[in-house]
Amino acid sequence: MDADWGEIAQYHTQLGYRPDPTNPSAHHSAPTAVAFDTRSELLWVGKDQGRVAAYVYFLNNGIMEFQRHIAFLSHPRQQGPVHQFLFNETGVISLGSHNVHMAQRGGMCLANIGHVNMTNLRCMTFTSRGTSEILVAGDQDTMFVIDLNKKQITKEVPAPNHYFLMKKSKYICAASRNGCVDILDPITLKVINTWNTRSAQLNDMDVQHDFIVTCGASLKQGTYMADPYVNVFDLKNMRSFPPISFPPLVTYARMHPKMVTTSIVVSKTGQMHVVDIANPHNPIVRQVLGHTHLALFDVSPSGQAMVFTDTEGYIHVWGPTSKAVSFVDQGLPVEFETEQPNFASIPWSEDFPVNMVGLPHYSDALLSAWPADLSSDVGAPPAQFDQAYVDAMMPNGNVGLYGKAVAGTRRNQVVDTRSADKPQSSLQAPKFLSEKARDGFKGLTMDTSDIETSEDIVPSPIRTDIESLKSVVPNMYHLFEIKFSKFGVDDFDFGYYNKTHHSGLENHITNSYANSLLQLLRFTPILRNLALQHAATSCLDQHCLLCELGYLCDSMEKARGASCQATNMLKMLSQHPAAANLHLLDGDRIASSSAMKIQGLLRFLLDFMSRDYGKTSPGINDLENATATSSQSLIRCDQCKSETSRPQTNYVQDLAYSPVTSNGNKGVDVADSYLAAQQGVARGRMAPAKLPSFSQILKKSIEREQVTRGWCTTCRGYQPLSMRKIIKSIPQVLAANTCISSVEEKKLWATPGWLPEEVGFIIDKEHIFCYEGAELDWLIKNGKYKLYVYSLMGLVVNIEPGPTFKPHPVAIINAAHSEPQKPAKSQWHLFNDFHVKPISAREALTFNTSWKTPLVVMFQLKAANNHIDSTWLQRLDTSILYQDQSPEAEDKSYTLLDRNKEAPTPGTVIAIDAEFVLAKDFEYAVNSDGEKETIRPRIHSLGRVSVVRASGDRRGVPFIDDYINIKEPIVNYFTEFSGLTETDLDPKTSRHNLVPLKLAFKKLWLLLNLGCIFVGHGLRSDFRVINLQVPREQVHDTQELFWVEAQRRKLSLAFLAKSVLNLEIQGHMHDSIEDANTAQLLYWKYKELLESGRLHEELKKIYAFGVKHGFRPVKVAGQSAQRTETPPMVDDAQPGALLPYQPPELLQGS
């Protein structure tokens, strides 16, 4: 407390009230509750008979004066006084003996919550859920948990004791009159410790950080007398401190909200001591009251003001007399009553047009703006007939006219033009692909490739080009769900939601909340390049997230706008040992919201991917250098002034919105140089605006100076420690979590143009300076300083449609920075899972405080933009293709490739087949009609994959035959179709050497990027489960090669083997080597038919044969069934000679 502290305002609480005839002495009654608002510059006072008033101060000729701002009744007068106040963003919560009242700061009632068991309430506090939930207790046996969002009681808890005070810090501390303080767990509300203060009766208690202070009274000669000391308890170590002496007899004790070891103690007569708990022998003493006695006492959240009330009803506000006082650090502006304009009288007459009345200005949807689906056709004009149709009508005797029948409609039918004129208020779901195909064969196909989804049609009368400014969430930001038919996810038309060449990510997979963040990482060129370079190395770590990011980036580039899925990446995240501990997984009971998980996941990914990169590059860690801010952390003890330092690495900056200085970059003289360069412009013109700029916030967050309490090795005790950073280097990729926690911070982001697309940094004299806008442009033009310019890559935004909808994150990315050639202008895109849409820069960088808030922002060094590295393709480590995973096995079904003779090259033909098991079955929901709807399709896992040579001397011989070690539970092995049994995939009983999924996947990924041509049957579904994206030019699917589109039916491998190759396969069960070998035989037969010009004719015969035999493979009369061996038998005399090809009856003209 400074020497200039004194009384700065005084006000009587009865001023402004009408006299109460039933209680003439009411004006002398003292307040029963007083508290500073934690969100606004208001002082709240509660009195008897349920009266609540808020007071606001203002300066009048330099003198601080108070006046009543608002007043209302929180409960009926007969229910007694107001006991306590709490505050949150919504309003003020006041506590009576029988109810909890919640009101807006303007006085409007939001909720009045009561219960039959609320008989004598005395105290309340917030729980572990922050300001959205409170715990209420009192001189009764029951405590209540109240959800402030739902405005209802959610839980009744037996009270361990009768409490009159509760405060929350790390724990909930509840004080009872008998001298004990119970320490409750804020989640379970169970007592974890009890502190006996040794007082016969407690009078007051306060909690801040790790300390509890209490004051009480002792029983002396039959009466209670205030104790001459303050009790102190250490919450961190759960032990008592020596009491603090206070000879004037303590009545109230408070902890200072800013100085963690400072306590303020006041006596009944008004003597006040400001004491340091660590050094209580030198208190600061003040006398705050004169001839009256103290009634109540409180300290403002900013620590700049104190309030005392006396027994005569006066409020005394203390603070520094030489400067302005603020109750809160960054408070909401006080809302005053708006003055209503005087409208001119309207001359109502028959000649006065009603449209001259006009409408007041409004920003929300009017009640009259009904959505289209609530409007009725009754009274609407009839449907319009086409005039040509009317002219062609024929007379029907003397009765009237009749119209000719038109193809596609019944007689006298026309199109209902009324329904066509109605606006569509939501996105129309596309048809399933199977439905489109069926309609196509009926001649009803409608081309939807050019259909533009109507985003402008929302139930709001406000017309704007910026969707983010609308009060209702536009369609393009809504959470889209995949609809499943009996054919599964493959039947969903993803192309309807994406007309760009950028691929979206499907969201029906566990942990798919990470899709937006994965998109942001993929569109950051430096991270993309390093991930692919690492994936091309020999890394086989099963938990390497960097490899998976590289595989995902490669898949999305090869997809060219087709839908992708991050199955393997998200599966590895689920199995990562650290992810569950950090509560980053879906289904975690103590996991936070998806917004908090996104911010935690960014920190987790950058940290662990940097470790992954270091495992294969033990020297210089390029990924750490590219993503980590290197600094020296200086820790200084405020007591002994000793200073220690330690190196620190930080991958993600958490933005801190505490007040910044007027010129955060002062010290490098750049701002002054810029001002001097502006001719004819006064220096005062460049003064910064009241709102801090993004660059100021970013600079302060990177340097982050803070004061905390910790152990000092010099003092050998816990002391206040000042911490600051000396920045050594900043990374090429700068990631930041927005950490928005208040309405003020949301409004800051919602300020137009607040987030710049470029920022610049200067590191000078152990400090970092950040610039944007005109200053940055001047620095770039000047070229005097070593300036690092960063471009905004994109951001992850949280969309909150409303209380009945689930919030979800989306990515907003400038794809121009990741193009190989720099485009002429920016290319902002919205990535809402599989819905991808180009948007304007204004749309991208406009935020809405009610439903669109940023979570993560990503900047990259501008010099690295558009540097897309492809050299990793020439540095692929292919050693795994030539390594035997089962060196000790005797009956191997494969023969490894010869590195010298059979190294895969672009155009090498290989045949592949995979077998799968069921990890999760369908999930259904029953609709109102009693019909089943699929809400989640079957989830398969790769069980076995086989790759066979399809060219060369050893054609038909497999070189990969891997059985997979599956981590998740298996629901069904599909033995009849997969040939896999439980003993094949159980590590304890399998006779095969089970390999990790990553090892099997990497072999296929290497073959893909070596340019091999994949031959198989039904490869689309195989590649989907494997999560491998193969370009069309590298796939020859025999299911598509032997398909006549007009026939609709696609033929099975067994039927084609019999009808084309005269081979019987899958006689007992499926075998992947046999199926892959059959596919490559069919492929070469197709090539033969195509080159000879007989393909079209033979396809007709194949379908005719199928119709005759029901499309099932049948034995040819007089021919024994043949079955290929696994591996296929090869003639030793003629290496690579296959079984002789015998044409079936249909190819012989039968």
Curated annotation (Swiss-Prot):
Q: What is its EC number?
A: 3.1.13.4
- Residue span of region Disordered: 1118-1150
Which Gene3D superfamilies would you find in this protein's record?
Cysteine proteinases, Ribonuclease H-like superfamily/Ribonuclease H, YVTN repeat-like/Quinoprotein amine dehydrogenase
Q: Which organism is it from?
A: Pyricularia oryzae (strain 70-15 / ATCC MYA-4617 / FGSC 8958)
Domain of life (superkingdom): Eukaryota
Per its UniProt record, the required cofactor names are: a divalent metal cation
- InterPro entries, from UniProt? Exonuclease_RNaseT/DNA_pol3, PAN2, PAN2-PAN3_catalytic_subunit, PAN2_N, PAN2_UCH_dom, Papain-like_cys_pep_sf, RNaseH-like_sf, RNaseH_sf
What protein is this chain from?
A: PAN2-PAN3 deadenylation complex catalytic subunit PAN2
Where is the protein localized? Cytoplasm
